[in-house]
């Protein structure tokens, strides 16, 4: 529906963009290091049937983060940015996905199997890995990253 599309754009793209821009503007005179981590998704990097809005808004967030990171390079005290895919995390969204019909979401069986096989990451472990990455020297070297591919001292 149009409202679902608007909500998806707002949550996955508009709000992170506005927060990022506000942070960068308000902190541009800071002497300390500035870092911005936007939470992306692997779905923004490939097509997932039934997820047109989710995939496209996460792809837009990836591109916004990458361009903003590049724009920062020429500035005094440039901020480091990265759009990070956190992996498949056992959140409320996962429950909603698994409750989907095959008609609405053709890949539903894959997500049911991920839970059944214990392959979902816990929110707590994911948050720890994201914070470790945010605080590491590696943060921002790649403006688009996937936490599953980064060694962050687990």
Where are the regions a protein language model picked out?
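Substrate-binding pocket helix/loop in short-chain dehydrogenase/reductase
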Residues: 1-6
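Active-site helix of classical SDR
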Residues: 20, 57
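A short helix-coil junction within the Rossmann-fold of NAD(P)-dependent oxidoreductases
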Residues: 22-33
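Alpha-helical segment proximal to the catalytic Tyr-Lys
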Residues: 25, 70-74
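Residue(s) in the substrate-gating loop at a strand-loop-helix junction
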Residues: 41
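Active-site loop-to-helix junction immediately N-terminal to the catalytic Tyr of the SDR YXXXK motif
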Residues: 47-55, 67
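C-terminal helical subdomain
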Residues: 83-84, 91, 99-154
